[in-house]
Amino acid sequence: MSLLLGLPLPAHAAKDFGTWLQGVRTEAVGLGLDEETLDKALAGLKPIPRVIELDRRQPEFTLTFKQYLQRVVNARRVKIGKQKLAEHRQLLERIAKKYKVQPRFMVALWGIETDFGRITGGFPVIASLATLAYDGRRSKFFRKELIVALRIVDQGHITSDKMMGSWAGAMGQNQFMPSSFQAYAVDYDDDGHKDIWGTLPDVFASIANYLTKSGWRDDQTWGRPAM
């Protein structure tokens, strides 16, 4: 994959990464994760130079709310959003009744995060998080997210090879970080898996649950114009 292309790491760096990764494995085992699952998830894992490159060159700028709307909520996205709202109306209404979040808000967040599931990122989440944790700039944060990602695999929600997301580790159609997955993901179709990658009932219910647990008030509008 082109996303994995980059300059090879020096031999000593690769060796140091392997030693560091063993430390992660030891920590995960100490937290009760299955050793066989960990061995499979961590086998052959290497840092991804492209992830470091993207982390280093994040743009530093701010947008006004109007600029944000023009960039993110364009006419095309609004049109598709209306189509998706109609297409999944019955499912969305059932979820809305349970979580007290109107269907249009679930679809709107879905569209903003991943263009209705179209752009979810093409990076292997565990390798990306390991790269960022090893890099050192935000090591504590990303190491924690890596351990949680491994726990998600250990719980059987998804296999490590299918756990894809953004370069920063945001996963699935609603772009949850692993810790957010643990806090908000829902197995709405009751199949034993919280599948925010490919199961729309789980995707929508997880979005609604996230909003509800974050203090969403269904009796209030999302915002008001201010002078």
Sequence positions of predicted segments:
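Sec/Tat signal peptide C-region and signal peptidase I cleavage site
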Residues: 7-14
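Bacterial N-terminal signal peptides
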Residues: 1-7
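Catalytic glycan-binding domains that act on GlcNAc-containing polysaccharides
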Residues: 33-227
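N-terminal module-boundary/linker segments of secreted carbohydrate-active enzymes
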Residues: 14-32
